[in-house]
């Protein structure tokens, strides 16, 4: 990807009236039209394969799935938990990954794409789209000097949501491994029914586990491991 096609303007949109600090603004990336065409072509090629690549526990951005499905499952699990009897209950943890797109390390994204065994030329093109960008912040109608990011993927980039959910599958794998090693006790909606340890909602996730110190430590260690891997 030629660098001049990957120049990006960032404009700050206030999240609420009277925004007076940086965290109260949402950065929106204004990308080159040619760049958007290239990334949309990549997305169009990737989308048909996502149902096979992405776990059923992620329902956002995957063709044939609806985010409402996970909301219904979550409500049913919580309802079941309120009816359970026993000395030890279960817990639900909702996690909002702050600045999730901004913190992904580029080497981690490449490792995930290679893990999915995408064709090397496609991986090279995707990583060129991700890593060759230069950014200017649109401020009071002016465009200051450009700078080059060293990590993260851009908000409002057509490719970004799909890269993100592919990266989140690594967290799902870490959770499944904990469950298989009996280090994480998931929740069952019914006796003999499917066990649920987590559900994904794009960049949010809901975790289910037994409410004891052992599981709390396991949840924390799993999240720490993912943060260390992904940045």
Label each residue range with its predicted role:
Residues 1-231:
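Nucleotidyl polymerases of mobile genetic elements and RNA viruses
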């Amino acid at each position: 990807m030629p660098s001049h096609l990957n120049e990006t303007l960032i404009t700050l949109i206030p999240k609420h009236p009277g925004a007076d600090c940086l965290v109260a603004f949402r950065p929106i990336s204004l990308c080159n039209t040619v760049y958007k065409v290239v990334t949309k072509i990549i997305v169009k090629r990737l989308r048909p394969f996502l149902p096979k690549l992405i776990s059923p526990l992620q329902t956002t951005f995957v063709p044939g799935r609806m985010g409402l499905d996970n909301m219904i499952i979550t409500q049913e699990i919580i309802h079941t938990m309120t009816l359970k009897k026993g000395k030890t209950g279960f817990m639900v943890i909702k996690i909002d990954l702050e600045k999730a797109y901004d913190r992904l390390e580029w080497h981690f994204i490449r490792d995930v794409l290679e893990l999915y065994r995408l064709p090397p030329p496609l991986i090279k093109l995707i990583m060129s789209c991700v890593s060759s960008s230069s950014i200017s912040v649109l401020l009071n109608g002016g465009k200051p000097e450009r700078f080059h990011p060293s990590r993260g993927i851009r908000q409002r980039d057509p490719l970004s949501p799909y890269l993100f959910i592919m990266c989140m599958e690594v967290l799902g794998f870490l959770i499944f491994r904990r469950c298989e090693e009996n280090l994480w006790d998931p929740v069952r909606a019914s006796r003999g029914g499917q066990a649920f340890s987590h559900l994904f909602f794009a960049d949010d996730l809901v975790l289910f586990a037994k409410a004891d110190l052992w599981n709390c430590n396991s949840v924390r260690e799993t999240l720490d491991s993912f943060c260390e891997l992904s940045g």
